[in-house]
């Protein structure tokens, strides 16, 4: 089922709803005319089964669309993206640490995504912790890589469920739809290779809560079911119905576009793919209740007209118009030909627009062709006017002409990032603005000694370092020798000055050089 079919449901509903609430009814099959007496006239009961003699009514339960059912069934889901966050640190020779964060992707498994989603919904504190980047570790002259595998959950991500084939439709899916959710496969691929979509509830059937049980009266003839009177009192015929599954539930699509699930013994053909069903909303229920009241009122008007005919013993074309069948189905048609009251078996169909039965001037279309008139008289009070136009004495009340107003969803789903084609990631580093990480799985890898240089540079640096170290040792040894040498010389000279005595020329002993010097200066 193409996704566009759901978008055109509101457009298809209006003509189908006219089938349920016709502005007029006219025979599509008209039997031979036969004269009758005035006492054979009778008013049709549009609320009582007159379908092929099925007059046996019995109570039964059936399933119909829930009131408020809308064309697009919303399925809440979430997307799960596998993200690997890598923190790479390098500590150089002087202890300066540089940290680089990188992101990569991996395709997650559905089980892991389901567990991550449950973490988020349960408010597990580990979820808050997992939102942070991995804590980078570091070692001197080494490169340390710390990685964390995270499952990124973004919710809600709302998809539309097609009730006809249970396929899902959303712009986050590559082709706009997903038909792969089964018991064994519980996810859909998305526009992102490393992101999958999953429903919040693993049982997708629970999202299709569109049915309700109702009570009505089954109309049957022997073992054959002809139709039923619904919970609101309106008869619905099974003639022309076809089998149609909604959300996997087998039911019948009736000619008026409604859908019911009920037990029947008759063999029914499957509906063609283009057969859709009417929406069931509060407005349709309200109008259906008003239709029942209107049909009761019309029956009272018919009985009043019939009583007038019986009392006055006279029949007019205007009075015969009250005896027309007001809903699709089997009934009678009446007319007056050459002052003779005539009756014919008829099967009535609904009229959507007046152009269907009056396509041109003077033509009353019945059974696909212009019906002949007798001296300007057709049937059911329809005549040919003096100007050649077909005149229909009455039409259904304005109540039955109003258009059906469909309920619109009051829930506006949040736009998921993947629904915008511009957010389809081409590079791994574009995921930073997209992700919220979950379920950390931290791994640490410590490399060997790394100086941050190529291989030849490492050897040059080691050689230079060794040479500098040798030169430093030699320099220190040289400095130590120079510091020790002046101290030893001074100590030896001091000792000599104290012990050596000098004899002067006069024969006196001079104890030191200073005394000798002072003595010499005295002599001078």
Swiss-Prot record:
The keyword Transport does not apply. Gene3D superfamilies: 2.30.29.130. Residues 1-19 form the signal peptide. One of its GO terms (biological process) is fusion of virus membrane with host endosome membrane. It is found in: Virion membrane. Primary surface antigen capable of inducing and reacting with virus-neutralizing antibodies. Almost all human and veterinary vaccines are based on the functional aspects of the G protein. InterPro entries: PH_Rhabdo_glycop, Rhabdo_glycop_CD, Rhabdo_glycop_FD. Its main location: virion. This is Glycoprotein. It comes from Rabies virus (isolate Human/Algeria/1991) (RABV). The lineage of its organism: Viruses, Riboviria, Orthornavirae, Negarnaviricota, Haploviricotina.
């Amino acid at each position: 089922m193409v996704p566009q079919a759901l978008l055109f449901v509101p457009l298809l509903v209006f003509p189908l709803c006219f089938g349920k609430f016709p502005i007029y009814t006219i025979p599509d099959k008209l039997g031979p005319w036969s004269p009758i007496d005035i006492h054979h006239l009778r008013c049709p009961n549009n609320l009582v089964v007159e379908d092929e003699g099925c007059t046996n009514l019995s109570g039964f339960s059936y399933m119909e669309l829930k009131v408020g059912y809308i064309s697009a069934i919303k399925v809440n889901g979430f997307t799960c993206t596998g993200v690997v966050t890598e923190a790479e640190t390098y500590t150089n020779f002087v202890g300066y640490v540089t940290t680089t964060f990188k992101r990569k992707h991996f395709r997650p498994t559905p089980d892991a995504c389901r567990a991550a989603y449950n973490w988020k919904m349960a408010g597990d504190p580990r979820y808050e912790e997992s939102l942070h980047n991995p804590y980078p570790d570091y070692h001197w002259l080494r490169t340390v890589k710390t990685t964390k595998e995270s499952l990124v959950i973004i919710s809600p991500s709302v998809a539309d469920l097609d009730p006809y084939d249970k396929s899902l439709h959303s712009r986050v899916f590559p082709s706009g739809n997903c038909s792969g959710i089964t018991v064994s496969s519980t996810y859909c691929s998305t526009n992102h290779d490393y992101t999958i979509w999953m429903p919040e509830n693993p049982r997708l059937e629970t999202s299709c809560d569109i049915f309700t049980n109702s009570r009505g009266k089954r109309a049957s003839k022997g073992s054959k079911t002809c139709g039923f009177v619904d919970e609101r009192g309106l008869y619905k015929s099974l003639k022309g119905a076809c089998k149609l599954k909604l959300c996997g539930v087998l039911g019948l699509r009736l000619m008026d576009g409604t859908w019911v699930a009920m037990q029947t013994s008759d063999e029914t053909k499957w509906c063609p793919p283009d057969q859709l069903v009417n929406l069931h909303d509060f407005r349709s229920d309200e109008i259906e209740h008003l239709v029942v009241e209107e049909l009761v009122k019309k029956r009272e008007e018919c009985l009043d007209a019939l009583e007038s005919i019986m009392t006055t013993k006279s029949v007019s074309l205007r009075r015969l118009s009250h005896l027309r069948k007001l809903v699709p189905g089997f009934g009678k048609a009446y007319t007056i030909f050459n002052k003779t009251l005539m009756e014919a078996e008829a099967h009535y169909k609904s009229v959507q627009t007046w152009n269907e039965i009056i396509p041109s001037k003077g033509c009353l279309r019945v059974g696909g062709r212009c019906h002949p008139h007798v001296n300007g008289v057709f049937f059911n009070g329809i005549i040919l006017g003096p100007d050649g136009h077909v005149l229909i004495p009455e039409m259904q009340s304005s109540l039955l002409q109003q258009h059906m107003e469909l309920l619109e969803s009051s829930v506006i789903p949040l736009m998921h990032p993947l629904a915008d084609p511009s957010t389809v990631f081409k590079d791994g580093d574009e995921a930073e603005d997209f992700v919220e990480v979950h379920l950390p799985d931290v791994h640490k890898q410590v490399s060997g000694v790394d100086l941050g240089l190529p291989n030849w540079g490492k050897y040059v640096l080691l050689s230079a370092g060794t040479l500098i170290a040798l030169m430093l040792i030699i320099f220190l040894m040289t400095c130590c020798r120079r510091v020790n040498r002046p101290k030893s010389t001074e100590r030896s000279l001091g000792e000599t000055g104290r012990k050596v005595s000098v004899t002067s020329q006069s024969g006196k002993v001079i104890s030191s050089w200073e005394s000798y010097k002072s003595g010499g200066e005295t002599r001078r």
